[in-house]
């Protein structure tokens, strides 16, 4: 293999096999290898139309998604240079990279508030629709092995980031090395991707390697624990590439789940017993835990930061394989790795085939075909990165153990040298400190003091109120005298600042501490609160207008749409589950901060049942309609249908939207549908009617019984109008993924005069998140048969009219509401 174009061409061999599965949190979208190849070729043609030529730089700045993948391969197919940017990077960094790389085009995302405007660009969210009309063209000649394929900018500490030049040869070499190291991987496996694709570790191990072998990659929209665990349990995942911080998050999620059931002690006893058992018995012992990860999950691939012995032991004891590797972006990036059949705890494994490693004064130095040629237009940095005899200086400190495996001691730049000349490796102290009760997060840095450096701990407490001095004293009890922590600071935010791969930005922490005159045991308050910035960004408000006591609705103008955006943004930023039902008119900004800090469990939604859409219960509906519903309806309603021919071309689920005048709207509309659609359609009903504000016990019994009947015999599910909307939205997404259409009444209540009422904003959220066509429906005559307020129906004629399907998912929220209202009103006139 000489370049990534060979991987792209291999997509043709895998045809309809799933290449990418994207879980938006609402829907599940699949892209086959054949579809991905066509998207890439069309993207190349589109880039040609935009004036992008061979060797031109294209900035790729967005979250992991099918569109990101299509854009990447389109740039490769065009012969351009991919310039990936961390999705969470700020606008200034993106501008700096665009300027330094001389990018001529950008692919960016609407998920960010700020966008690049200095160069032509396209939004990732628009790519699918935009490429539909693009005619594929013959691809340009294949690139030479030494042509630049990617320009990857390092995260850096201070100053301008450096552009790492990676050629087609570099990437192809490392891809061959990685796949050769793990012959167990095959096209039958699915991989869960949790790290940003702009990070080379994820790109090589979790993106290029699986696609080159015909595997399936699963992306999730947010990294909250529930989304990750749902992907594990529903997607038949075999392996996941992760950094240690993500493994810690998953470990905490497992421990909390056991503790919530009163089984925390049992889990600890199982973990203690497991090391003495053979692998098969370990797997049997931890069957309850393994079920949470799916029946085929087997492998954690860890990299990007040192893996603690505690994390390795936890997952290994549970019967999972944990393979740790090591590398740098400059090396494409993988240099060493443990093997699936053999792991050495605390070591990062053995050099990949073709990788040479040596230690010079403790520094790890490497060379091989995967090592980059230099930094982009930075000759001084390039010369400083290589020795006179051509070895790349990694800047990492290491040693080789008795098995020949490499052990990484830490970054040379992070090494703390005390005034006594003692070398202190902060990673070793962090591992001890993180185990102490009262610590949520921590890092250890060197602070200038007495002609050397003080070993200084920065601690995020867990909310238990335990004094920091007590925490540090306990940690020091497990550390030898020469390396003990001699200073500490309380970090007042919920998390330490991190990169998108969850590494702590120690340089940022140190800069903040150096700015404080009272560094030692002071409380550190960040100059710009991350949570306040997030709220202000979502709501489009200046920072000084968002205060802890501000009411989100009354003071800040939080709408139903903005509430969903805010909850999603919080979950993405803080990697937690947040119940949108907990955010109401009386919720203050400080209340939400408390929810984040407490990481409260989200209550299970009420009445959302997927099993009522199964074949069995669709049969129940057929039976109920045949012997009860249709005969009863025909006693009062003479039903006729217009426009049914407009439904003939429907090839999948849709959203039927209708005016609402009577309790009989739903059966009249469903009986107007052909049977193939009728029993694959679920109806949204006002949740508050069934579950809220009972006047007495009899009304409670009646309403709850009515819901049970409607759910089982009519295919109804609850849709709240106040709070808790997102749970119902997720339910609608799952129904759509199972091929079920939806019937909703966007007015939200029955019209008492018969005139169409304004549609609620929730419809726009449904259309955009579900990405389904909208079929307008008008029902005339029921306001005379059973109007609002009537207790008994009269006889009358009813007409149901269907309009042309509308594709509105890529229009604005306001346009969706306007177009939908006009379509239904047009059928009523």
Where in this protein do the model-derived segments appear?
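AMP-binding/adenylate-forming catalytic core of the ANL superfamily
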Residues: 106, 359, 368, 373-374, ...
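Conserved AMP-binding/adenylate-forming
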Residues: 281-406, 412-415, 429, 440
């Amino acid at each position: 293999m000489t370049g990534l174009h060979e991987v792209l061409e291999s997509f043709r061999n895998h045809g309809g096999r799933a290449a990418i599965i994207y879980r938006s949190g609402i829907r599940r979208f699949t892209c086959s290898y054949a579809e991905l190849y066509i998207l890439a070729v069309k993207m190349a043609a589109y880039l040609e139309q935009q004036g992008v030529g061979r060797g031109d730089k294209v900035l790729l700045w967005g979250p992991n998604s099918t569109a990101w993948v299509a854009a990447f391969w389109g740039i490769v197919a065009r012969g351009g240079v991919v310039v990936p940017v961390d999705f969470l990077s700020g606008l200034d960094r993106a501008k700096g990279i665009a300027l330094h790389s001389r990018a001529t085009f950008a692919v960016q995302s609407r998920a960010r508030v700020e966008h690049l405007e200095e160069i032509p660009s396209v939004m990732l969210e628009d790519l699918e629709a935009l490429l539909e009309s693009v005619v594929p063209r013959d691809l340009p000649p294949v690139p030479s092995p030494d042509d630049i394929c990617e320009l990857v900018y390092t995260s850096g500490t201070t100053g301008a980031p450096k552009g790492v030049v990676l050629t087609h040869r570099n990437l192809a070499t490392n891809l061959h090395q990685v796949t050769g190291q793990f012959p167990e991987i095959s096209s039958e496996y699915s991989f869960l991707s949790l790290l940003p694709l702009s990070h080379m570790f994820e790109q090589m191990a979790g993106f290029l390697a699986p696609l080159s072998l015909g595997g399936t990659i699963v992306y999730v929209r947010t990294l909250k624990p529930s989304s990750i665990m749902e992907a594990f349990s529903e997607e038949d995942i075999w392996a996941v590439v992760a950094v240690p911080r993500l493994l810690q998050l998953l470990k905490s999620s497992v421990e909390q789940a056991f503790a919530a059931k009163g089984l925390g002690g049992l889990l600890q006893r199982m973990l203690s017993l497991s090391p003495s058992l053979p692998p098969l018995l370990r797997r049997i012992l931890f069957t309850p835990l393994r079920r949470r990860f799916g029946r085929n999950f087997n492998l954690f691939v860890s990299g990007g930061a040192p893996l603690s012995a505690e994390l390795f032991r936890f997952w290994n004891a549970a019967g999972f394989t944990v393979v740790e590797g090591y590398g740098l972006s400059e090396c494409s990036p993988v240099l060493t790795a443990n093997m699936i059949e053999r792991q050495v705890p605390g070591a990062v494994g053995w050099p990949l085939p073709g990788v040479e490693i040596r230690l010079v004064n403790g520094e790890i130095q490497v060379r091989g075909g995967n090592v980059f040629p230099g930094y982009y237009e930075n000759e001084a940095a390039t010369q400083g990165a290589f020795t006179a005899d051509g070895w790349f200086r990694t800047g990492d400190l290491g040693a080789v153990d008795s098995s020949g495996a490499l052990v990484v001691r830490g970054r040379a730049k992070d090494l703390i040298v005390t005034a006594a000349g003692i070398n202190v490796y902060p990673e070793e102290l962090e591992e001890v400190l993180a185990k102490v009760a009262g610590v949520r997060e921590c890092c250890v840095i060197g602070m200038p003091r007495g002609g050397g450096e003080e070993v200084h701990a920065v601690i995020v407490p867990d909310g238990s109120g335990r004094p920091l001095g007590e925490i540090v004293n306990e940690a020091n009890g497990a550390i030898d005298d020469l390396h003990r922590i001699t200073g500490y600071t309380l970090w007042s935010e919920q998390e330490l600042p991190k990169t998108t791969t969850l590494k702590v930005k120690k340089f940022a922490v140190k800069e903040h501490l150096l700015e404080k005159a009272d560094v030692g045991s002071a409380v550190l308050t960040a100059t710009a609160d991350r949570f306040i910035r997030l709220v202000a960004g979502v709501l489009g408000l200046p920072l000084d207008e968002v205060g802890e006591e501000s009411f989100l609705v009354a003071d800040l103008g939080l709408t139903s749409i903005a509430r969903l955006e805010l909850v999603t943004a919080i979950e993405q930023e803080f990697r937690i589950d947040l119940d949108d039902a907990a955010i109401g008119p009386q919720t203050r900004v400080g209340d939400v901060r408390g929810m984040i800090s407490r990481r409260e469990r989200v209550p299970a939604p009420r009445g959302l049942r997927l099993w009522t859409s199964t074949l069995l219960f669709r049969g129940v509906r057929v039976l109920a309609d045949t012997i009860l519903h249709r005969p009863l309806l025909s006693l009062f309603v003479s039903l006729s249908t217009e426009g049914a021919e407009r439904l003939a071309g429907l090839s999948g689920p849709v959203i039927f939207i209708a005016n609402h005048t009577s309790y009989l709207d739903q059966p009249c509309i469903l009986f107007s549908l052909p049977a193939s659609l009728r029993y694959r359609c679920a109806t949204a009903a006002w949740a508050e009617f069934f579950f809220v504000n009972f006047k007495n016990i009899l009304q409670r019994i009646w309403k709850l019984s009515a819901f049970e009947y409607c759910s089982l015999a009519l295919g109804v599910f609850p849709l709240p109008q106040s709070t808790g909307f997102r749970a119902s939205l997720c339910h609608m997404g799952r129904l759509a993924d199972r091929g079920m259409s939806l019937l909703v009444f966007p007015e939200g209540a029955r019209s008492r005069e018969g005139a169409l009422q304004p549609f609620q904003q929730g419809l726009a959220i449904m259309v955009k998140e579900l990405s389904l066509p909208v079929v307008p429906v008008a029902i005339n005559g029921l306001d005379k048969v059973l109007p609002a307020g009537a207790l008994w129906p009269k006889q009358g004629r009813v007409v149901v009219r269907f309009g042309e399907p509308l594709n509105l998912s890529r229009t604005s929220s306001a346009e969706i509401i306007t177009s939908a209202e006009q379509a239904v009103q047009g059928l009523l006139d």
